A protein has these predicted regions:
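Active-site-adjacent capping/gating segments
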Residues: 137-139
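Divalent metal-binding pocket/active-site signature
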Residues: 1-112, 124-127, 132-133, 151, ...
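Short secondary-structure boundary segments
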Residues: 120-122, 146-148
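Short, basic, glycine/proline-bearing loop/turn elements
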Residues: 113-119
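Structural detector of well-ordered beta-strand residues that form the stable sheet scaffold
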Residues: 50, 95, 117, 143-145
Length: 171
C-alpha cells in the first residue's frame, strides 16, 4: 500500500517515521523492526526521510546508520547544499523533526548530512538545552517548524499552535 502511494507526485518523503519510547504504546522491538523497514523503503525509493524520535536518541541514530540513511550512496542521490562559504555540503535528506537531543548528538547528525528541526519548546524558559542546541546547528542544517497544533511556543503556550506562530519559535 505505502509503496503504491509513493508513486503519486504529491508524496515527497517517507515520514514521519521513527521511535517513540515516551509512552511505550508499542513494544520497542516492534517499533525498531518497522522503523528499519520504513528506512529500507525510503532508500529503495530514493526518498527523503522525516524522523520522529522521542526518548530514543541512541536507538534512532544506530538504526539510521545501520540501514544506510547516511551512506555515501544515499547522499549521491541528492543535490548537496551550499555552506556559508559556498562550499558544497553532503545532504542525506534525513530530517529529525522536533529535535530534542543533546548538542553532541546534533553535531553527529549534522556531520552525517541530516537536518534538525526546532519547535515551540525552544521558547520555554526552562528549556535552555534546546536553545543551546539550536545555537550550535549551522543554519544550513536547521529548520524551524510549528508542529501545529502541538508544542505551542511562548507567549501562546497552553493554546493550540498555529503555523503563524513559527516566527516566535524562530526568534
Amino acid at each position: 500500500l505505502i509503496r503504491g502511494l509513493t508513486k503519486k507526485d504529491k508524496v515527497q518523503a517517507i515520514g514521519e517515521i521513527g521511535l517513540d519510547y515516551h509512552y511505550d504504546l508499542s513494544e520497542r522491538d516492534v517499533q525498531r523492526y518497522w522503523f528499519r523497514r520504513q528506512i529500507q523503503l525510503a532508500n529503495e525509493l530514493k526518498m527523503p526521510i522525516i524522523i520522529h524520535s522521542r526518548e530514543a536518541d541512541q536507538d534512532t541514530m544506530t538504526i539510521l546508520k545501520e540501514e544506510g540513511a547516511f551512506s555515501d550512496e544515499r547522499k549521491s542521490w541528492f543535490e548537496p547544499r551550499k555552506g556559508p562559504d559556498g562550499q558544497l555540503l553532503a545532504d542525506s535528506r534525513v530530517l529529525l523533526h522536533c529535535f530534542s537531543g543533546s548538542s553532541e548528538m546534533a553535531e553527529q547528525y549534522v556531520k552525517l548530512g541530516a537536518t534538525l528541526s526546532i519547535c515551540g519548546p525552544v521558547t520555554f524558559k526552562n528549556n535552555r538545552k534546546t536553545r543551546q542546541v539550536a545555537e550550535r546547528i549551522p543554519l544550513e542544517f536547521l529548520l524551524v517548524e510549528t508542529d501545529s497544533p502541538y508544542l505551542t511556543p511562548e507567549p501562546f503556550r497552553g493554546r493550540p499552535n498555529k503555523p503563524s506562530y513559527v516566527e516566535y519559535t524562530a526568534r
